[in-house]
Amino acid sequence: MSEDKPEGATHLQNEKPPDEEIEPEELLEVAARALSARASLPDPTDQILLSPNYTSGWPAGAPEGVTIHTEEGWHDPSVAWLRNPKSFASAHFCIRRDGKIVQLVWERDRAWHARSSGMYYFGIEHEGGSGLGDVPILWKTGRNADDLRDDDHMLIQSARLVAYLCTKHDIRIQHDFERPPVRDSVSHIAGHDQMMGNDHQDPGPEFPWRAYMRRVERFANM
């Protein structure tokens, strides 16, 4: 894909995804993922539905972090839109409210999920909204984050995925709770609202960052 394709996320629409089968070389990628997982945490991905919207490879020094998004919509139409070439948008992963993790872009490639700083970060979308629009928040309050035993399946699986990515790719498990733009902070796990060069506000002020980061750290140390 060309470098000048837009990389900003858009409002997600209910579009039919392109028909697509996993090619033989992509099966090799799945095998490589399994081998890599032996040296890191288990890969928690449940399903692979590849998007054509990506840029091959990463810039030097990347990936260096993870961006947390909300879909501002529902899971199935969101995944469909991010797999539609007309959207010029994608994410590495989308997580459904019940915790199902769908991968859209290989870890070796760049997804189109945030302008500027996004080219250095993995992108993870979460079903529902940020609380700043018409789409409701679908995560829970983050209670019992220390023992990982509450019913917030989406954010528990999200934390598990982030811990996997951080341990595999040597990304620091760190979030700047003062919330400055990511290039002015030490956040390696950041909200979309912290990405430089964009005007998005997700995951919103109600996102339970402290509980979420405790979960990521717990999973990384299991």
Give each language-model segment a name.
Residues 115-134:
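Short coil-to-beta-strand
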Residues 74, 130-132, 197:
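Feature marks short, surface-exposed loop/turn motifs that line or immediately flank catalytic pockets
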Residues 1-117:
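N-terminal catalytic cores of peptidoglycan-degrading enzymes
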Residues 65, 121-123, 188-190:
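Structural preference for beta-strand elements that scaffold enzyme active sites
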Residues 2-45, 135-222:
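Basic/polar, cationic surfaces and motifs that engage anionic cell-wall
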